[in-house]
């Protein structure tokens, strides 16, 4: 991995299964865990990663199954991590549509969320490797080249977001 690749790593922090305690956590502990995990991904110092209001809104909108005794299980933390990843790209309603089947599977005990999340994490590693390879070939020495790269990344981001939105629309029927 080159020095440039080292700069890209913080862009893709993920909450790893090993990072999640095997005990249920209170909301403040959940927030601390997410702040420690995703702090390196923030654009500016003091940027908010996760707040009580956000978590309460996710619960109110039923983005994850209900908590018991104000404690969040490992499955809740996995779902909140997925919400965190999705919220920068798609709307809350789209997140709900995306996670509905997952939540039902967890609630009905027909889905192993940890195995699903492990598979997701494997996909993120492959995605990062592809991204790093593409970025390594980009020449960003001249301002005009940087502008071209910025525009290209924004365009790719829009394409991926639109593709995700189409898939979400197909989930809705």
Predicted regions and their residues:
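Intrinsically disordered, low-complexity, charge-dense segments enriched in Lys/Arg
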Residues: 98-101, 105-173
């Amino acid at each position: 991995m080159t020095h440039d690749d080292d700069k890209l790593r913080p862009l893709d922090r993920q909450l790893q299964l090993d990072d999640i305690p095997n005990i249920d956590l209170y909301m403040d502990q959940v927030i601390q865990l997410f702040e420690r995990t995703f702090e390196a991904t923030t654009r500016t110092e003091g940027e908010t990663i996760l707040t009580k209001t956000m978590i309460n809104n996710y619960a109110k909108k039923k983005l994850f199954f209900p908590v018991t005794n104000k404690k969040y299980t490992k499955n809740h933390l996995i779902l909140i991590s997925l919400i965190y990843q999705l919220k920068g790209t798609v709307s809350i309603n789209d997140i709900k549509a995306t996670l509905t089947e997952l939540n039902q599977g967890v609630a009905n005990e027909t889905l192993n969320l940890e195995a699903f999340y492990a598979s997701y994490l494997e996909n993120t590693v492959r995605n990062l490797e592809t991204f790093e390879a593409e970025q390594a070939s980009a020449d960003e020495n001249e301002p005009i080249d940087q502008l071209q790269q910025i525009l290209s990344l924004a365009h790719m981001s829009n394409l991926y977001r639109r593709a995700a939105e189409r898939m979400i629309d197909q989930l809705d029927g």
